[in-house]
Amino acid sequence: MKTLIVSTVLAFITFSAQAAAFQVTSNEIKTGEQLTTSHVFSGFGCEGGNTSPSLTWSGVPEGTKSFAVTVYDPDAPTGSGWWHWTVVNIPATVTYLPVDAGRRDGTKLPTGAVQGRNDFGYAGFGGACPPKGDKPHHYQFKVWALKTEKIPVDSNSSGALVGYMLNANKIATAEITPVYEIK
């Protein structure tokens, strides 16, 4: 009987810990699945809608004071990957970004949120655009739970600088990694 009780308690603790895990979901993108053309860049030889997908996160870690979202392609043939989007200073009360939140004018972002400069050269979302014929690229859509309310960056800050600041203030991350290739 004692073993049954201990086993039940351990199972409950394990289930509770798993249920509370920090995670991100989207209605438009899934890990391992091909991005649709709506999330592909418009330019650089690519023809897409250049629209960021919706993102919803849950299981927020204790102590979270703000969030950030990044989109990074580690497979880009640059020697340093490719930053497609950085947005920081999302209030801790926000757990959702709508479709096209990454538009250049920032009108769909929460008050106080700041978009950094992507590797296409502007502040906002830049969709997938791998070289034609290259292997499938992995696009890391990552939500960061942060231990600070504000990351001291602006709309001209590079992805590398934003990434450095996020790593210095990270509590946890949650990620969706779809793929894209142009055959």
Curated annotation (Swiss-Prot):
Its main location: periplasm. InterPro entries: PEBP, PEBP-like_sf, YbhB_YbcL/LppC-like. It is found in: Periplasm. GO terms for cellular component: outer membrane-bounded periplasmic space. Residues 1-21 form the signal peptide. The keyword Disulfide bond applies. Disulfide bonds join C46-C129. Keywords: Disulfide bond, Periplasm, Signal. It comes from the Bacteria. Pfam families: PBP (PF01161). Belongs to the UPF0098 family. Encoded by the cryptic lambdoid prophage DLP12. Homodimer. This is UPF0098 protein YbcL. It comes from Escherichia coli (strain K12). The gene is ybcL.
